[in-house]
Regions:
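A secondary-structure micro-motif
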Residues: 1, 20-23, 30-200
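N-terminal membrane-targeting segments
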Residues: 1-13
Protein backbone atom coordinates (compact mmCIF):
# COMPACT_ATOMS: atom_id res chain seq x y z
CA UNK A 1 0.00 0.00 0.00
CA UNK A 2 2.76 2.44 0.98
CA UNK A 3 4.65 1.50 -2.19
CA UNK A 4 1.57 2.23 -4.32
CA UNK A 5 1.10 5.62 -2.64
CA UNK A 6 4.75 6.43 -3.26
CA UNK A 7 4.50 5.40 -6.93
CA UNK A 8 1.30 7.42 -7.39
CA UNK A 9 2.91 10.54 -5.89
CA UNK A 10 5.99 10.00 -8.03
CA UNK A 11 3.85 9.64 -11.16
CA UNK A 12 1.94 12.84 -10.32
CA UNK A 13 5.24 14.68 -9.79
CA UNK A 14 6.58 13.42 -13.13
CA UNK A 15 3.40 14.54 -14.92
CA UNK A 16 3.82 18.00 -13.35
CA UNK A 17 7.46 18.05 -14.49
CA UNK A 18 6.44 17.19 -18.06
CA UNK A 19 3.81 19.98 -18.10
CA UNK A 20 6.39 22.44 -16.78
CA UNK A 21 8.94 21.32 -19.38
CA UNK A 22 6.35 21.70 -22.17
CA UNK A 23 5.48 25.22 -20.98
CA UNK A 24 9.17 26.15 -20.81
CA UNK A 25 9.73 24.75 -24.32
CA UNK A 26 6.85 26.86 -25.71
CA UNK A 27 8.22 29.95 -23.96
CA UNK A 28 11.72 29.20 -25.26
CA UNK A 29 10.39 28.86 -28.82
CA UNK A 30 8.49 32.17 -28.52
CA UNK A 31 11.63 33.94 -27.30
CA UNK A 32 13.73 32.50 -30.15
CA UNK A 33 11.15 33.67 -32.69
CA UNK A 34 11.02 37.10 -31.03
CA UNK A 35 14.81 37.40 -31.40
CA UNK A 36 14.41 36.66 -35.12
CA UNK A 37 11.59 39.22 -35.39
CA UNK A 38 13.69 41.86 -33.64
CA UNK A 39 16.60 41.13 -35.99
CA UNK A 40 14.34 41.50 -39.05
CA UNK A 41 12.82 44.77 -37.76
CA UNK A 42 15.74 46.27 -35.84
CA UNK A 43 14.27 49.77 -36.13
CA UNK A 44 11.21 48.85 -34.03
CA UNK A 45 10.76 48.26 -30.30
CA UNK A 46 8.68 45.24 -29.25
CA UNK A 47 6.86 45.10 -25.89
CA UNK A 48 5.50 41.69 -24.88
CA UNK A 49 2.13 41.16 -23.20
CA UNK A 50 -0.10 38.27 -22.21
CA UNK A 51 -3.78 38.06 -23.10
CA UNK A 52 -5.89 38.19 -19.92
CA UNK A 53 -9.36 37.92 -21.46
CA UNK A 54 -11.22 37.68 -24.76
CA UNK A 55 -14.31 39.74 -25.54
CA UNK A 56 -16.97 37.04 -25.16
CA UNK A 57 -19.46 38.86 -27.38
CA UNK A 58 -17.27 38.65 -30.47
CA UNK A 59 -15.78 36.13 -32.88
CA UNK A 60 -12.17 36.55 -31.70
CA UNK A 61 -12.54 40.24 -32.57
CA UNK A 62 -11.05 41.73 -29.40
CA UNK A 63 -9.08 40.87 -26.27
CA UNK A 64 -7.51 42.59 -23.28
CA UNK A 65 -3.83 42.63 -22.34
CA UNK A 66 -2.42 43.52 -18.91
CA UNK A 67 -0.22 46.38 -20.09
CA UNK A 68 -1.05 49.99 -20.86
CA UNK A 69 0.19 53.57 -20.92
CA UNK A 70 2.29 52.87 -17.82
CA UNK A 71 4.31 50.41 -19.93
CA UNK A 72 4.83 52.86 -22.80
CA UNK A 73 1.93 51.61 -24.91
CA UNK A 74 -0.46 53.88 -26.79
CA UNK A 75 -3.68 53.67 -28.75
CA UNK A 76 -3.00 52.86 -32.41
CA UNK A 77 0.03 50.61 -31.83
CA UNK A 78 0.22 47.42 -33.90
CA UNK A 79 0.07 44.00 -32.24
CA UNK A 80 1.82 40.94 -33.71
CA UNK A 81 2.83 37.37 -32.84
CA UNK A 82 6.43 36.34 -32.26
CA UNK A 83 6.49 35.31 -35.94
CA UNK A 84 5.64 38.81 -37.19
CA UNK A 85 2.05 37.84 -37.97
CA UNK A 86 -0.41 40.71 -37.61
CA UNK A 87 -2.88 40.25 -34.74
CA UNK A 88 -4.49 43.69 -34.61
CA UNK A 89 -4.32 47.17 -33.15
CA UNK A 90 -4.64 48.75 -29.69
CA UNK A 91 -7.98 50.59 -29.81
CA UNK A 92 -8.57 51.42 -26.11
CA UNK A 93 -6.05 51.85 -23.33
CA UNK A 94 -5.68 52.54 -19.61
CA UNK A 95 -2.65 52.79 -17.35
CA UNK A 96 -2.28 49.01 -16.93
CA UNK A 97 -4.55 47.48 -19.59
CA UNK A 98 -5.32 47.77 -23.28
CA UNK A 99 -7.97 46.45 -25.63
CA UNK A 100 -6.71 44.97 -28.88
CA UNK A 101 -9.11 44.84 -31.82
CA UNK A 102 -8.03 41.95 -34.05
CA UNK A 103 -7.72 41.87 -37.83
CA UNK A 104 -10.85 39.66 -37.85
CA UNK A 105 -12.95 42.73 -36.99
CA UNK A 106 -14.13 44.41 -40.19
CA UNK A 107 -13.74 47.86 -38.63
CA UNK A 108 -9.96 47.60 -39.14
CA UNK A 109 -8.70 48.32 -42.65
CA UNK A 110 -5.05 47.54 -43.37
CA UNK A 111 -3.09 48.48 -46.47
CA UNK A 112 -1.67 45.23 -47.84
CA UNK A 113 -0.14 43.61 -50.89
CA UNK A 114 0.23 40.20 -52.47
CA UNK A 115 3.90 39.40 -51.80
CA UNK A 116 4.47 37.56 -55.11
CA UNK A 117 3.10 40.31 -57.38
CA UNK A 118 3.19 43.50 -55.32
CA UNK A 119 -0.47 44.24 -56.17
CA UNK A 120 -1.98 46.30 -53.36
CA UNK A 121 -5.36 46.42 -51.71
CA UNK A 122 -7.03 46.75 -48.33
CA UNK A 123 -7.51 43.88 -45.85
CA UNK A 124 -10.40 43.69 -43.40
CA UNK A 125 -12.28 41.00 -41.52
CA UNK A 126 -14.50 38.92 -43.83
CA UNK A 127 -17.28 38.07 -41.34
CA UNK A 128 -19.84 40.34 -43.05
CA UNK A 129 -19.04 38.64 -46.37
CA UNK A 130 -19.93 35.24 -44.90
CA UNK A 131 -16.39 34.16 -43.98
CA UNK A 132 -16.04 34.16 -40.18
CA UNK A 133 -12.44 33.93 -38.95
CA UNK A 134 -11.09 34.93 -42.39
CA UNK A 135 -9.84 38.15 -43.95
CA UNK A 136 -10.77 39.73 -47.27
CA UNK A 137 -8.26 41.60 -49.46
CA UNK A 138 -10.28 44.17 -51.43
CA UNK A 139 -9.71 46.62 -54.32
CA UNK A 140 -7.16 44.56 -56.24
CA UNK A 141 -6.69 45.48 -59.92
CA UNK A 142 -8.82 43.25 -62.18
CA UNK A 143 -5.72 41.90 -63.94
CA UNK A 144 -4.13 40.69 -60.68
CA UNK A 145 -3.10 37.03 -60.84
CA UNK A 146 -3.84 35.32 -57.53
CA UNK A 147 -2.73 31.87 -56.45
CA UNK A 148 -3.68 29.76 -53.45
CA UNK A 149 -1.21 30.21 -50.58
CA UNK A 150 0.15 33.50 -51.97
CA UNK A 151 1.34 35.47 -48.94
CA UNK A 152 -0.38 38.76 -48.06
CA UNK A 153 1.76 41.29 -46.16
CA UNK A 154 1.47 44.85 -44.87
CA UNK A 155 2.64 47.58 -47.24
CA UNK A 156 3.84 49.80 -44.42
CA UNK A 157 1.99 52.73 -42.85
CA UNK A 158 2.08 54.89 -39.76
CA UNK A 159 0.38 52.01 -37.89
CA UNK A 160 1.84 48.82 -39.38
CA UNK A 161 5.49 48.27 -40.31
CA UNK A 162 6.13 47.01 -43.85
CA UNK A 163 6.36 43.27 -44.50
CA UNK A 164 4.38 41.89 -41.55
CA UNK A 165 2.45 38.76 -42.50
CA UNK A 166 -1.35 39.03 -42.63
CA UNK A 167 -2.13 35.63 -44.10
CA UNK A 168 -2.40 33.38 -47.14
CA UNK A 169 -4.84 33.49 -50.07
CA UNK A 170 -7.44 30.72 -50.10
CA UNK A 171 -9.93 31.92 -52.71
CA UNK A 172 -10.48 34.84 -55.08
CA UNK A 173 -13.01 36.41 -57.42
CA UNK A 174 -14.35 39.63 -58.91
CA UNK A 175 -15.95 41.94 -56.37
CA UNK A 176 -19.52 43.24 -56.36
CA UNK A 177 -18.64 46.16 -58.68
CA UNK A 178 -17.24 43.85 -61.35
CA UNK A 179 -14.19 46.09 -61.83
CA UNK A 180 -11.86 44.87 -59.07
CA UNK A 181 -10.75 41.56 -57.63
CA UNK A 182 -10.86 40.37 -54.05
CA UNK A 183 -9.19 37.49 -52.23
CA UNK A 184 -10.25 35.51 -49.16
CA UNK A 185 -7.27 35.21 -46.83
CA UNK A 186 -6.58 32.71 -44.05
CA UNK A 187 -5.03 34.76 -41.21
CA UNK A 188 -1.44 33.80 -40.42
CA UNK A 189 -1.98 34.32 -36.68
CA UNK A 190 -3.66 31.39 -34.92
CA UNK A 191 -6.25 33.10 -32.73
CA UNK A 192 -7.31 29.82 -31.09
CA UNK A 193 -3.90 29.26 -29.45
CA UNK A 194 -2.84 32.88 -28.94
CA UNK A 195 -1.51 33.52 -25.40
CA UNK A 196 1.24 36.12 -25.77
CA UNK A 197 1.51 39.05 -28.19
CA UNK A 198 4.04 41.74 -29.02
CA UNK A 199 3.27 45.41 -29.44
CA UNK A 200 5.23 47.34 -32.06
Amino acid sequence: EARNDYLQKRLTQMEDDVRTADALERENKRLRELCNLRDEHADYVFEDAYIVSWDSSSWKNAFTIAKGTGDGLAEGMAVVTEYGQVVGLITEIGSNWATVTTVLDNSLEISACVASSGNTGVVQGAYTYGYPNKLRLNYLPAETILRNNDQVVTTGSSLYPKGLILGYIEDAGMDETGVAKYAIVQPAADFDTLEQVFIV
